[in-house]
Amino acid sequence: MTPETRPPTSAAVLFDADKLVLELRHDAEGAYHAFPDDGPGAPGAPRVALSLEEALHARIRPAGTAEAVLRAWAEGAAPRGAVALADPSAAPPVRVRAGAVVIRNGAVLLIRFTEEDGASHYEIPGGGVEEGETPETAVVRELDEETGLAGTVGPEIARVWKDGRHEHYFLVAATGEVGPPETLDTYGGVPVWVPVEELPATPLWPRRLSWRIEHWHRTGWPERPAELADSITELGPPCGW
């Protein structure tokens, strides 16, 4: 491999005033944004400038680099110049997970886990995709096992890379009522309904998805799945990026 053909290891973080400059590219799923680089990736790709609010809801690749840049920018210290490329999609996932976003009467169904000290955290119902399954079939099975609800899969709203996992999240229309605890496979968790408006302040994994679900519920669901890396390790601090 020569320097001319070696994949780039860094990208340029460029700003035009207070807007992030990105390249607009396309793949089979449609448009996405990428950090400019000096490699052969997309010669002549047009550039666009996004505000922070626009960038938070854009599909920016690679997702790991986007997470680092958006976090720093949202916290008031946007990086500039060369940054390392971090692409979690480049390696095979250690596990593929499917999660069901079920909303009923203004509340979202979550699994609550209570620690020994009384503190709680929450997860979106779902689990691993088994051999022979698709994420769509797995999410229906997992919803039934963890809550007793029957589900009809709607659009995929987010893809999250976390701790080596590739997680798919779907809007799911569910019927029935949550089953008795002794019939559910939740690994010690309890299904609960949480008002959607409380999600930004709820200690929910994945953290970067919590406030987005509340935002999308108010403003409309994304036409294509959001692509997010999530390296957050603590649920206490607020996350708006």
Role assignments for model-derived ranges:
Residues 1-30, 64, 203-221, 240:
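Hydrophobic, helix-prone linear segments
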Residues 16, 20-45, 103-145:
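Conserved Nudix-box catalytic region and its N-terminal flanking loop in Nudix hydrolases
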